[in-house]
């Protein structure tokens, strides 16, 4: 069960899973079309970057890779999705999309 104080985006995704899944496929479509290893690497990087407060350095420590590797992967997500991680709306859309994908996978 998702609680609001855990993460508001997770609550939104859990409250309307079909819509959240549709948004996730719209936002992350090109990423989801990649092979499993690359897709998971990029989704893990975005998710970890969020958990690290948007810090490539902190995300790199959590992922056991160089911060430039994190930045490279994030640029790849930006290129594939057409969304800039410096634009607040795009960040919110990507955050919701990643959480929706994770919830969808957990339910399977």
Can you annotate each of these PLM segments?
Residues 1-108:
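Cytosolic nucleotide-utilizing catalytic cores of signal-transduction proteins
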